[in-house]
Amino acid sequence: MAKTPEDFSATPDTPGDKGHPGTVDSAPLATRRRAQALAVCIAAAFLTLLDVSIVTVALPSMEHHLALSPAQATWSIAGYTLTFGLALIPSGRLGDEFGRKKVFLVGMVLFTVTGVLCAVATTATWLVVARLARGVAAGLVAPQVVGLLHQMYPPRERGRAFGYYGATVSLSTAIGPLLGGAILQCFGTADGWRWIFLLFIPLDLAVLPPALRLLPESRRAERRSSLDLVGALVLGLAVTAVMLPLLETGGWSGRRWWLAWTGLALLAVFVLWERSVARKARRPLVDLNLFRERAYWVGTLVAAALYGGFTGIFIVLFQFLQQGLHYSPFKASLCTVLFTLGSAACGIISGRLVHRVGRPLVIVGTACTALGLTATALVVGGSEAGDNMFLRMALPLLLAGCGAGLVIAANQTLALHRVPRREGSTAAGVYQTGMKIGTSLGTALASSLYFGQLLASHGDFSAAARTGLLGAAALAAVAFLVALPGLTLRGRRDGEAAVGAVQEVEPVG
């Protein structure tokens, strides 16, 4: 029979239940080995996330030397994001069913191979196809990273692990443009983009031996369930239809609206199908009882809105600084480094505090992010060509970055704290899919506002940047409003339950 809500609220870390045998995690790891395994997971997450930001800087070089059309140029970046998002939930289920370590290793091998294919691409089509495959590989790895952290750490220690994970997200976003700009400057624009992919390869390979040796095994307690292939297909079509309109350039034509509405309709079909599968006592692709946990679905919405907000600022600022103020990619990246440093530092701090402070960290963090982005928009809107933008934006971006860092680790810890370990990778896949959709929405919103205002103002880059950044700030404000009920009586009880879980529940693996 399908699980009841109590299966999620009462025993968040039980290995399974009678209806659906769960994942039996390996014995608890020694502290030193667990720290080493954490480093492996963080390294893999860093590489898959770095691929997005570092390649963006190389896009003009790839456009020129492979004769990419505008559509191909968009797909070389957006296609990676799309297939990354598509793979997250099915690969999360694969990890829960067949073992997170196995799926992690397969994903890293594929990520390495596709990096080689990108580096040696000789045509635009070759590059785009390799980028699509690379996104699938990254999507195989990402849910296993979170699932493994969920598996390796008892609840009272997960906040710290997720703090390091959140810092990794922030660092990869900022280091990518800096590193990409440095590589292009060192190797030249003709072949520099190839070196970006080539330098990934030894790093990817370096992750494999320690992963094979250190990562814990997970296995099914009884006979494996058959995979929900119909659910995977319907969900894949739904996510594609929702994300494609957000990733395409240009205005919102009738076709893009139809795609978006079709995607939402397919999501409804997916929910009905998953309920049908659960009623037949089979294992669905996504156990919908996850969404009976208020902390989980609220946390997923907060993550989607927040990632949409702070992703949008990079799109706008890089365009403004390079096109409007004629900064080099490297110099433009330096202007945003304080956001990253603040986010990384506060991510680690948040991970250490979440089990003592709870939900208020998310409230304060989203508020700081929204205020910081709004202040950045006002500063940029009043700027002139001779201004030192690093100094003008320093405090607002630092505030926004610190706010984002407070949210990332705390929100993920609170969202997943009552998820059973047997569902760890699947729950992470759903959570990260929400992040990807939010990221795509933020990119589309900020870009549309920026270029729309640029056209309307006849080339006023400052006004365009202000408008785009206000759009990003609006998404951060949405994250704040979604998280705000955490200060109500029920929200305080949810936070207390989270702390209670970390104090009482012992690890099984």
Report the location of each language-model feature.
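Cytosolic juxtamembrane N-terminal segment immediately preceding the first transmembrane helix
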Residues: 1-50
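12-transmembrane solute porter fold
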Residues: 34-57, 70, 257, 281-493
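Extracellular/periplasmic helix-loop-helix junction of adjacent transmembrane segments
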Residues: 58-87, 126-129, 330, 334-335
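Membrane-interface helix termini in secondary transporters
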Residues: 61-63, 93, 97, 182, ...
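Helix-breaking motifs and short loop linkers at transmembrane-helix boundaries and internal kinks
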Residues: 65-67, 99, 120-126, 326, ...
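Central cavity-lining transmembrane alpha-helices of secondary-active solute carriers
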Residues: 78-92, 138-146, 150, 337-349
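Helix-loop-helix hairpins in multi-pass membrane proteins, especially solute transporters
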Residues: 101-230
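Hydrophobic transmembrane-helix bundles of small-molecule transporters
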Residues: 185-301
